[in-house]
Amino acid sequence: MKRGKRYLENLKLYDKTQQYSSDEAMDIVLKTANAKFDETIDLAVRLGVDPRHADQQVRGTVILPHGTGKTVKVLVFAKGEKAKEAEAAGADYVGAEELVEKIQKENWFDYDVVIATPDMMGVVGRLGKLLGPKGLMPNPKSGTVTFEVEKAVKEAKAGKIEYRIDKAGIIHVPIGKKSFGKEKLLENFRTVMDAIIKSKPAAAKGQYIKSVVLSSTMGPGVKVNPARIFE
């Protein structure tokens, strides 16, 4: 794969074989995030679990103290008082069957989070094949199937993110933008890592955190020593 000149220049700024403390790694990531736009800072964590086993799944939600830097559009499936509550809380789209039809007919996905009240799941369930692959299907585990509509909308808007292990045993999450600066990004990073560590399945054997890599949208990956996540 051919790499651009900027990418190759960035590789000279650090030793890519070395594992750094999170503090040192963030310095390098910010130094190499030199594109002309506000790059997203991403985290990839490889875990010592086998995602093929139901008792070794790792997923959860966490509210980033400084948000993701992204404007989050929220769609809520609710009726009556709960629909009014969603609108008052700042939901971008609120509706019922008519929104299900819109999604089915128009392949409409102009939103980042979908919340539904439990009584709407019979209707929303018809969207499983459309919303599921995009990670948008409301789910009680992530707090998006709930009667506490106001709380769910406000948390989504505040930067609540869901993390889940993929088939390769890796969790990928964005932790903010370059413009946040080092301290805020480190706080977001450590908040996510703390949540992932606390999500360790009882069935997981051996080393749980195998590798931690920080990168910017256009920059190379920088390894964090799993023993120095909070340094």
UniProtKB/Swiss-Prot annotation:
Please state which protein family the record places this protein in: Belongs to the universal ribosomal protein uL1 family.
In its UniProt record, a GO molecular function of this protein is: structural constituent of ribosome
User: Some GO term, biological process aspect, for this entry: which one?
Assistant: translation
Keyword Repressor belongs to the record: yes
* InterPro entries, A to Z: Ribosom_uL1_bac-type, Ribosomal_uL1, Ribosomal_uL1-like, Ribosomal_uL1/biogenesis, Ribosomal_uL1_3-a/b-sand, Ribosomal_uL1_CS
- What is any one of the record's Gene Ontology cellular component terms? large ribosomal subunit
The entry describes its oligomerization and partners as: Part of the 50S ribosomal subunit.
The cross-references to CDD domains, in alphabetical order and at most eight, read: Ribosomal_L1 (cd00403)
What job does this protein perform?
Answer: Binds directly to 23S rRNA. The L1 stalk is quite mobile in the ribosome, and is involved in E site tRNA release.
Q: Which residues cross the membrane?
A: none
Keyword terms: Repressor, Ribonucleoprotein, Ribosomal protein, RNA-binding, rRNA-binding, Translation regulation, tRNA-binding
Q: What name does this protein carry?
A: Large ribosomal subunit protein uL1
Query: Sorted alphabetically, which PROSITE patterns does this protein's record hold?
Result: RIBOSOMAL_L1
